[in-house]
Amino acid sequence: MFSLPRTGGACVLYRTPHTDYFTRLVQHSEPEQLVSLHDLPLSGGYVVMPFVVSTATPLLFIRPDEISRHPMAEADAEGTGKGENGTSAPVNDATTAGLSLPGSHATDEAEERGRYARSFASAHSRLLHGELQKMVLSRRLHVRHGGLNAYRLFLAACHSRPGCFVALWWTAATGCWLVATPEPLLEQTGSDWHTVALAGTVPYMKEVPPTWSEKNREEQAIVARFIASQLNGIADHLQQSATHVTTAGNICHLCTDFRFSLRHPSDVRALLLRLHPTPAVCGLPRAAARQAILADEASPRRYYAGFSGPLGLEGETRLYVSLRCMEFTPSLATLYAGGGIMPESVEQEEWEETQRKLQTMLRLL
């Protein structure tokens, strides 16, 4: 029932925050590949958007032939291999069948540390010379496998991240990805729309209020100002919340909510073009930051820092930024993480921030 297609087509499992069920989508034919968000249909599908659209990472619109919803309680019984009588029940593997739990890191940490330091130095120089106000610098970690069940990982992410959007998708064009993200890019409830400015990161410590540096506060304020400016002229009845703290796994972020209405259905496409990528995953000025990322980062982001989710699918639009995510191949899981670099940033502190973010997904393994 939960097998992903092995050749052609597409399959998606997704769970929206604080719900007790997930949705399964299956398309029997190949998903539509789009050149730009300008071409994005406005209803009836699931969007998979990369950080930058290219031939290697196309923008996909999945039009499901099958849509089904499954209570988490029933899924848990199947996912753990326990049937109603408590005996072992078969569990269908995803297209990554043959993978196992990670035995070791395939990424040499010393080499990765050096690559990150060089990337940071280049990015930081751009900031100090006034080319950029902020830049998000990311890296990735390869972990070897040999028998992993992606469906079980999806269920584990649903349980450990109740406030996150959790998605598992597979297509021939993208491969298999698992995302557990706290950041909505654009979501709809009735006639009301919602997005957030989410930035600034400190470790979560139980019963200890987080302390925010001026760097973290300004980093988040940059994102909030950007989003407010992009909503100007397209959003009606705009309400901006006070900045507050939100927790996602082992880390805390600063968050500002924006709630509004849109005048026309086509404004959804226009707003996505305005918002993606936000300074929370790219930087400012946006075009210059995007070019710096492509020049300075040691590895391509692929679908990390893009977004995915249902768009006008049975009346539901929930598009979330692909922050905490991992990509599966028959031999590796590749985990992605990044952090905002400011003129006052310290390389060691930024490295440690990416380490904490990687732990969010590593703990699932």
Q: What is each model feature region?
A:
Residues L25-Q27, P41-S43, A73, P184-C252, ...:
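Cytosolic ligand/metal-binding cores
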Residues P5-L25, R139-I222, G315-G338:
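An anion-binding catalytic pocket shared by soluble metabolic enzymes
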Residues T171-W177, A228, T243-I251, F307-P310:
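A glycine-rich phosphate-binding loop feature that marks nucleotide/adenosyl-phosphate handling sites
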Residues S266-L365:
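Conserved hydrophobic core element of enzyme catalytic domains
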Residues M1-D39, S43-T55:
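An N-terminal JmjN-like helical accessory module and its immediate linker preceding a catalytic domain
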Residues I67-G114, F120-A121, R144, V196-A295:
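Contiguous alpha-helical scaffold segments within structured protein domains
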Residues P58-E74, R318-F328:
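Structural signature of FAD isoalloxazine-binding scaffolds in flavoprotein oxidoreductases
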Residues M1-T23, D93, G98-A150:
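Terminal domain-start leader segments
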